[in-house]
Amino acid sequence: MNFKENNIYSGFKLLNIENLNEIGGVGLRFEHEKTKAKLIKILSEDDNKCFAIGFRTPPENSTGVPHILEHSVLCGSRKFNTKEPFVELLKGSLNTFLNAMTYPDKTIYPVASRNEKDFMNLMDVYLDAVLYPNIYKHKEIFMQEGWHYYIENKEDELKYNGVVYNEMKGAYSSPDSILYRKIPQTIYPDTCYALSSGGDPDEIPNLTYEEFVEFHKKYYHPSNSYIFLYGNGDTEKELEFINEEYLKNFEYKEIDSEIKEQKSFESMKEESFTYGIAESEDLNHKSYYSLNFVIGDATDGEKGLAFDVLAYLLTRSTAAPLKKALIDAGIGKAVSGDFDNSTKQSAFTVLVKNAELNKEEEFKKVVMDTLKDLVENGIDKELIEASINRVEFELREGDYGSYPNGLIYYLKVMDSWLYDGDPYVHLEYEKNLEKIKSALTSNYFEDLIERYMINNTHSSLVSLHPEKGINEKKSAELKKKLEEIKNSFDEKTLNEIIDNCKKLKERQSTPDKKEDLESIPMLSLEDIDKEATKIPTEEKEIDGITTLHHDFHTNKIDYVNFFFNTNSVPEDLIPYVGLLCDILGKCGTENYDYSKLSNAINISTGGISFGAITFANLKKNNEFRPYLEISYKALSSKTNKAIELVDEIVNHTDLDDMDRIMQIIREKRARLEGAIFDSGHRIAMKKVLSYSTNRGAYDEKISGLDYYDFLVNIEKEDKKSTISDSLKKVRDLIFNKGNMLISYSGKEEEYENFKEKVKYLISKTNNNDFEKEEYNFELGKKNEGLLTQGNVQYVAKGGNYKTHGYKYSGALSLLESILGFDYLWNAVRVKGGAYGVFSNFRRDGGAYIVSYRDPNIKSTLEAYDNIPKYLNDFEADEREMTKYIIGTIRKYDQPISNGIKGDIAVSYYLSNFTYEDLQKEREEIINADVEKIKSFAPMIKDLMKEDYICVLGNEEKIKENKDLFNNIKSVIK
């Protein structure tokens, strides 16, 4: 329909209409007349519709009330009176996104779906959740999601428990996370940004139930809301629904949700903090330093885009001068930079990890001297061109991976809208990009550096140093504090607390009423496609090399992958495959030093990457295919240069430049150490798979904890000639025509252009024939306890079901949904307090269950062991099974970006997995019934009896359970 400014549509006044050419949409900005709720609809042809409602929620302390509320409002509401409507939606919706997020100054609730009926259902449940939550009726919601005193018997130890409490204990375990929480405290000390909206575990137990509900009353009102709609949905219908069902029932309310601005400093602040490490760890090379500059108004689109480019130019590019200067000076092992435009005043951070103790002044001097040198002598124009091109490529490509476009646009809109700026300023980039391109012939970036960094007193230098025993001390203090609290309770109070825990358990264990479950809107099986999505793949040949062509529209961008089978690499050299991938593209070559190579890559492509990857041969048990994958994306017009660069890197990288190679090894080691804290569940599950499958054992050597140990050892041993010789040998074994496969995504016309150009690379590739290795890894029950200074655990258990004679069925994917959203969710998250838990049954036989930020070990493993009993007793009516089936099919039908489509198709090809197999899998999901789910009980029982476990987490907790492990060792070296 034709919308007109100043007209009223279902209670919403249309304030303005704006063409958003960069994203191919039209922005309609409304205000609700009665409540003054703000609403934006971006009209688009995109069928992946998005809805979000957000609120300004500046915290007044660090008890985490915004975060706890974000969890809690999704635990039942006026119309949807189940314990967790959110989980019911996860079970049975076709959503393409469903989540909620707490930021330092806002809380948002976004959903997305391609199905219109589903989209309206999601919008209904979310609006009811935020405006009419059951938190006022059930204090147990606050106890479960936030915190409570946990004690079952009078003689037991008193503990704290709660989902957010445990989540934040995990978040505060990582030095990276600690640093990123300290930085805002130093540059915004007088604002809400100095506080933890997520919650400081030391402060969370200070939050009362009364303060919790008061926060909702104050901020969760339409007058303080920012509502967003995106896609090809019926706008009038959407506005009418929001008004009639919700907003018309509210009056305008004056709400003070002002986000205060920090006054500038007269001089740079310098602050130092500590984090805990184990007694066995070395204090050296464990410090973190950051320089932080407040840039200014987040609603300035040009400045925001310019600093996105500058962050890449100074710290992220392989040619980045700040990174190079700091690494060359030996200050630290990994350098990164970040421009944060999601707060009222944006900030730019330069950060170094794994640095020596007490080097903060040297760090500051190197950064400031480098910046001054760039201003005085000018930034290399080629580096400027490369950095602008990289950022521009990403903007124009608009590939946000698995995230819906609408969600990304909402986040960009909120970066200005929340602060009363032009909501579209970060979407409309063309004008700003043209201004920034003037940097190629002016001092544009030099002036920014001088003004906002060199001469900026609103800045801070933050140091984070390791300290032994700090975590043990805090743990002992908490234990003592809880003992004192327990001793201060009279008998009546203690009985009340025990009684409250019982009531909470009863509520958690009581099934929802049938009528309440049926209040949650859901789709029927008629709403899902019976046919699996087919990605076009045609097997062709270019000069004798098998080439897979995926013919679909890519906006004249080539998405190219070269695969080289690595099964001629001997077992003892397997880790060097991972190392070779980390080095290629970051080292100098015959014709480029590494900085010039980085610039050439960014000028001509959207990136060239290298990775070690494995594929299971699904037609043969425990057989897999290891590959080295080279990927690039580039405009079709730049195909020739992209292929020349791939040849330059593959065939002419200088593997004798050991100074550069050692820098890369140290940086990779530092980044892996960060991942240990942030992705502990991945490490634990990889370990478990390595005990029971050859593929898992190989993956562990190229990307798991074994690979980390390998990097530590070669760095310590400093055997430079051995490293260089091994890399050369592995390179020669891998890059051969006999190992090669090509995958190309793009239309036929572009393919023909690529076909002619790629012949050059094929002609430069060796044609040697090497013997293939037969890998027979030592599998078995290694059961490792991996010690960290974290405060929570990641508990994994698994095995290989095919070794017990079981076969894969699509219904196993359904089982993952049932366990994840019913049994495991209730046993490990709701009752146990873990932040997350999920299972995975791979097509190759590998299987695992893993928890995330879990306060427990034994009770979690007991929950895993009780799965067969749950399955034997499993009951579900037709409605419940339909819900699970729809939710499982959703995982198969997510929108796929152009960059990922070809990856999926080639993974099927290399796994011997056909479209017919995919269709069969889909039918097995759709046709599964209760009996089929029950039939998996023996399989899970056999898996659990194998008793393959790995736990990564708190040292004290693991040592308390030492009988579970065959080997206990510290992770960080």
Swiss-Prot record:
GO MF annotation, one: metalloendopeptidase activity
Coiled-coil annotated residue ranges, if any: none
UniProt superkingdom: Bacteria
Annotated Gene3D superfamilies: Metalloenzyme, LuxS/M16 peptidase-like
InterPro entries according to UniProt: Metalloenz_LuxS/M16, Pept_M16_N, Peptidase_M16_C, Peptidase_M16C_assoc, PreP_C
BP GO terms, sorted: protein processing
Signal sequence residues: none
Annotated protein name in UniProt: Protein HypA
Gene: hypA
